[in-house]
C-alpha cells in the first residue's frame, strides 16, 4: 500500500498542477528572496564597507521579516491547496486508504514539491547573487563590483529554515487528515462557513479599535512619541480591520438583503447571497488583502522617501566638509583647530565659519508664556525647543543687517503658540519680537539636531548672547560652539583622512585637560558614506519586503478567486437552467468581484492616509525632512499600486469567469 502512495504522490502533483503552480511560484520567490537576504547579511565584503556594521544589522532585521513573511505565505498557500483537495482525499479514504496512508501520501507530495521548489529557489538566488550584491552597492553609492559571493553556510541555513517550514506543513496536513473521517474530508470544501456570532459587538469593538488606532496616528506630536506608539496603532488597526470585515460586511449585506427593491434584482440577489454564504471566509481573506496592501504602500513609500532624502539630510547634520562642535571651549580654539588641520594636510580653505549659540527646552507653555527647564530637572518631554544666536552671527550667516537692542529679538518659529506673535515671555522675562524670519537661516551654516527629533523647534536672535544668558542663571540653557570649513580637496582625498581627523580631535581633547571641556566632529564625506550605506540598505530592504508582501497579496487574491469560482460554478449552472443568460451571469460576476476585491484597496488607502502623519514624523528621525517630496512619493506609489492591483484583478477575475462558465 505504501508503494501505491509513492505513485499517487507524483500523479497527484501532476493532476492538481493548477493548484500547485501558484503555490510553487510563491515558494520559489520566497526561497529566492530569503536566500538573497541571507547571502547579503553574511557577506564578508559588506563588513569591509564604511558603515558595513550598520548595513549588516539593517539587513539582519530585513532577513527576519522576510523569513517570517515567507513562512506565513507558504502556510497560507498550503492551507488553500489542502482545503481544495479535501474531497479528493475523502474519496481516497472511501476507496480503502487508511489515514496513515493518506498522511504518508501527502508527506511524500510535500517532499517532492519541496525538493523541486526550494532547490530551484536556491539555484535562482545563487544565479542572481552577484547582480543583487552589485545592485545593493549601487544603491549605497559605492563602486559596483561583480564578485563571487556564493557561501555554503547560506545554502545550508536556507535549507534548514525551509526544511522546518515544510515540516510544519507536514504536521498541519497530518493533523487535518487525522481529525476528520473520509466523509468529513469529502464534504469540507463544499461546506458553507458558519455564521459569525456577536456581530453587533464585533462591529462596535472593530470600530473602537480602528478609531483609537487612527486617533493615535493623527494626534501624535513628535517623532519620539510616534516611534513608541507606532506598533500599538498598527496592532489596533489590524485588529479593527479584521473585526470590521468579519462583522461589518455581514451587517452591511443583511441590510441590503432587507432592502427588497435592491435585493430582489437577479444580479443583486445572486451576488449578495453568495457573499453571505461564505461570509467568514470572505472577511478573513479581504482583511488579509487590505493589511498586505497597506504593508506594500507603507514600506515602499517609506523606503523611497528615505532614499530620496539622503542628500538633504546629510547637509542638515554636516553643513561643511569638516565640522567640529564643542562645549566649554572658545571660538578661537575651534578656529585654530580647523586651520591647523588644513595646514597639516596642505588643504586650501575655501570657507570657514565659527559660531557660538545656546539651546534650551521648554517645560511648560501657555500661549506665548514659556517656562524653561531648571538645572537638574528631568527633561523627558519638552513642549518645544529653542536655539539662540547672537545678532552678529546671524548677520554673518545671512549677510543681512539686523538692528536689535534691549529685549528685542528676532524669531524663526515652528511652534504655533509663538508663531506670528509680537512678544513672548521666557520665565519672567518678556521679549519683543522685532522681526520674524520665514527662512531657516542656519541651513548650510550650523547643524540642527533638533530638526530630526521634533517638528517643533525655534530660533531666537538676540542683541548680545552673553547678556541673554545672564538673565537665566538657574535655567538649563546650554552653551554650544560649532566650527566648519570647506576645502579644495576631492571627496576621495577627504575620505582617506576621515579617521585621521577623528584622531586629531581626540588629541585636541587630551590637550584640554579640563573636565567638561571637549570637542567632537565629523567629515561630510565620511558621514555621507555611512548614510548612503544605511539609506541604500533601507531602500533595498523596502523593495524586497514589498515584493514579498505583493506576492502574498497576489496569492491571496488568486486563490480566493479560484476557490470561489469552483464554489460558484455549480450554483451558476443551476441559475442558467432556470433562465439566467450569459450577459446576466457576466454582470453578476463583475459586480461580485468588484465589490469583494476593491474594498480592501479602499481600506488600504484609508489606512495609509491616517498613518501618513505618524509615518512622516518617524521618517523625520531617519532623515526625511522634505515633506513635499514625501507626499509626491507616497501618491506616486499609490498610483503604481493601483495600476498593479487593477491588473491583478483583471487576470484573476478572468480565471474566475472561466471556471464559473465551464
Segments the model singles out, each with a brief description of its role:
Residues 3-7, 179-193, 566-570, 657-662:
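Short cytosolic juxtamembrane segments of multi-pass membrane proteins
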Residues 1-31, 195-200, 209, 244-293, ...:
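N-terminal Sec/SRP start-transfer signal
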Residues 313, 320-325, 331-551:
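Basic-flanked hydrophobic alpha-helices used for secretion and membrane insertion
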Residues 11, 15, 84-94, 187-188, ...:
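Short amphipathic alpha-helical coupling elements at transmembrane boundaries
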Residues 112-256:
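Hydrophobic alpha-helical segments
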Residues 39-53, 122-154, 212-228, 599-662:
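Short helix-loop junctions at transmembrane helix boundaries
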Residues 18-44, 54-90, 110-124, 204-208, ...:
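Hydrophobic alpha-helical transmembrane segments of multi-pass inner-membrane transport and secretion
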Amino acid at each position: 500500500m505504501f508503494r501505491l502512495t509513492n505513485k499517487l504522490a507524483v500523479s497527484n502533483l501532476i493532476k492538481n498542477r493548477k493548484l500547485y503552480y501558484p503555490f510553487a511560484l510563491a515558494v520559489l520567490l520566497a526561497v529566492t528572496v530569503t536566500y538573497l537576504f541571507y547571502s547579503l547579511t553574511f557577506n564578508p565584503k559588506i563588513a569591509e564597507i564604511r558603515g558595513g556594521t550598520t548595513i549588516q544589522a539593517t539587513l539582519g532585521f530585513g532577513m527576519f521579516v522576510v523569513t517570517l513573511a515567507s513562512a506565513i505565505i507558504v502556510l497560507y498557500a498550503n492551507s488553500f491547496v489542502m482545503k481544495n483537495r479535501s474531497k479528493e482525499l475523502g474519496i481516497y479514504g472511501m476507496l480503502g486508504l487508511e489515514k496513515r496512508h493518506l498522511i504518508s501520501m501527502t508527506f511524500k507530495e510535500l517532499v517532492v514539491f519541496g525538493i523541486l521548489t526550494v532547490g530551484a529557489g536556491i539555484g535562482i538566488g545563487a544565479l542572481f547573487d552577484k547582480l543583487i550584491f552589485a545592485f545593493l552597492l549601487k544603491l549605497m553609492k559605492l563602486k559596483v563590483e561583480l564578485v563571487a559571493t556564493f557561501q555554503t553556510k547560506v545554502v545550508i541555513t536556507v535549507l534548514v529554515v525551509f526544511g522546518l517550514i515544510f515540516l510544519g506543513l507536514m504536521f498541519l496536513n497530518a493533523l487535518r487528515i487525522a481529525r476528520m473521517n473520509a466523509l468529513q474530508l469529502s464534504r469540507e470544501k463544499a461546506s458553507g462557513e458558519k455564521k459569525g456570532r456577536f456581530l453587533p459587538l464585533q462591529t462596535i469593538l472593530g470600530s473602537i479599535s480602528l478609531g483609537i488606532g487612527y486617533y493615535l496616528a493623527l494626534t501624535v506630536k513628535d517623532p519620539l512619541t510616534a516611534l513608541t506608539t507606532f506598533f500599538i496603532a498598527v496592532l489596533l488597526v489590524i485588529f479593527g480591520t479584521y473585526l470590521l470585515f468579519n462583522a461589518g460586511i455581514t451587517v452591511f449585506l443583511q441590510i441590503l438583503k432587507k432592502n427588497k427593491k435592491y435585493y430582489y434584482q437577479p444580479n443583486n440577489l445572486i451576488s449578495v447571497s453568495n457573499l453571505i454564504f461564505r461570509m467568514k471566509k470572505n472577511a478573513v481573506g479581504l482583511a488579509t488583502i487590505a493589511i498586505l496592501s497597506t504593508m506594500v504602500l507603507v514600506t515602499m513609500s517609506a523606503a523611497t522617501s528615505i532614499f530620496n532624502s539622503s542628500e538633504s539630510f546629510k547637509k542638515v547634520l554636516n553643513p561643511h566638509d569638516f565640522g567640529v562642535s564643542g562645549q566649554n571651549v572658545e571660538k578661537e580654539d575651534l578656529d585654530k583647530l580647523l586651520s591647523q588641520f588644513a595646514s597639516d594636510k596642505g588643504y586650501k580653505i575655501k570657507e570657514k565659519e565659527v559660531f557660538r549659540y545656546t539651546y534650551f527646552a521648554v517645560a511648560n507653555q501657555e500661549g506665548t508664556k514659556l517656562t524653561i527647564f531648571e538645572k537638574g530637572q528631568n527633561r523627558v518631554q519638552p513642549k518645544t525647543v529653542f536655539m539662540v544666536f547672537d545678532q552678529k552671527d546671524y548677520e554673518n550667516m545671512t549677510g543681512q543687517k539686523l538692528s536689535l537692542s534691549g529685549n528685542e529679538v528676532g524669531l524663526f518659529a515652528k511652534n504655533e503658540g509663538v508663531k506670528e506673535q509680537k512678544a513672548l515671555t521666557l520665565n519672567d522675562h518678556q521679549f519683543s519680537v522685532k522681526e520674524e524670519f520665514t527662512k531657516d537661516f542656519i541651513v548650510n551654516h550650523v547643524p540642527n539636531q533638533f530638526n530630526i527629533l521634533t517638528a517643533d523647534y525655534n530660533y531666537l536672535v538676540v542683541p548680545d548672547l552673553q547678556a541673554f544668558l545672564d538673565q537665566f542663571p538657574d535655567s538649563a540653557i546650554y552653551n554650544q560652539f560649532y566650527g566648519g570649513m570647506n576645502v579644495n580637496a576631492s571627496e576621495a582625498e577627504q575620505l582617506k583622512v576621515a579617521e585621521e581627523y577623528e584622531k586629531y580631535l581626540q588629541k585636541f581633547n587630551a590637550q584640554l585637560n579640563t573636565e567638561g571641556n571637549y570637542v567632537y566632529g565629523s567629515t561630510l564625506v565620511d558621514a555621507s558614506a555611512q548614510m548612503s550605506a544605511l539609506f541604500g540598505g533601507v531602500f533595498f530592504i523596502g523593495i524586497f519586503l514589498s515584493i514579498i508582501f505583493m506576492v502574498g497579496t497576489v496569492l491571496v487574491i488568486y486563490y480566493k478567486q479560484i476557490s470561489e469560482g469552483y464554489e460558484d460554478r455549480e450554483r451558476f449552472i443551476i441559475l442558467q437552467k432556470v433562465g439566467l443568460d450569459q450577459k446576466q451571469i457576466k454582470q453578476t460576476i463583475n459586480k461580485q468581484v468588484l465589490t469583494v476585491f476593491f474594498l480592501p484597496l479602499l481600506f488600504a488607502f484609508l489606512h495609509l492616509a491616517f498613518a501618513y502623519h505618524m509615518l512622516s514624523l518617524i521618517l523625520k528621525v531617519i532623515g526625511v525632512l522634505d515633506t513635499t517630496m514625501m507626499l509626491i512619493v507616497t501618491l506616486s506609489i499609490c498610483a503604481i499600486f493601483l495600476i498593479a492591483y487593477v491588473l491583478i484583478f483583471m487576470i484573476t477575475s478572468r480565471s474566475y469567469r472561466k471556471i464559473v462558465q465551464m
